[in-house]
Amino acid sequence: MKPPSTLTDGVVVLRELREDDRAVVLSTMCDPLVAAWLNMPADPTDRDFDSLLRVVRAGRVSGERIDYVVTEAGADMALGSVIASRRHRGNYELAYLAGADGRGRGLITRAVCLLCDALFEEGVGRLELRTHPDNEPSQQLAQRAGFRREGVERASIWLHGSRVDAIVWSLLPEDPR
């Protein structure tokens, strides 16, 4: 799948990660509300951003991973990100994060819905996401975006050096949203 470089619903814009996002991304990676749920360095450096940028660009070229920075229409500051990674049988797994300026305004939920719509338009038949059982804001976002809770995968993800459970959520094109 060759994703478009930008998507918009008129309120949010999803665009590619750029070099000039470096300061905002590094700051977001240091945010305790983000770092608690992701495996990333405790004190990210320019080298970590460079590595992320390489992964994002390689994923887009191969079609295995689609990363977007979330911004508001009419503004260009990164507020968060949404990611879709190709999994087995043509399914995709979504992930998202919200920086401090992107929280509590519904923008990341809109971004997730926009990406879901684009993937379904391309013929993807199933989307999944996984949340930590204690990450209530992420679970609430999944529900607002129309995802259905399927169950718990025990010890299925690594987080800060330990295996932890994950709640599995799914969304099909025909699901009500």
Regions picked out by a protein language model, each given a short descriptive name:
Residues 1-33, 70-177:
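Acyl-donor (CoA/ACP) binding surface of acyl/acetyltransferases
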Residues 17, 36, 45-48, 60, ...:
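A short hydrophobic/aromatic micro-motif that marks alpha-helical segments and, especially, helix-coil
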Residues 33-55, 66-68:
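Conserved GNAT-fold acetyl-CoA-binding loop/helix
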Residues 48, 54-57, 167, 172:
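Juxtamembrane helix-loop transition sites at the ends of transmembrane segments
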Residues 58-63, 147:
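Short loop/turn motifs at secondary-structure junctions and domain boundaries
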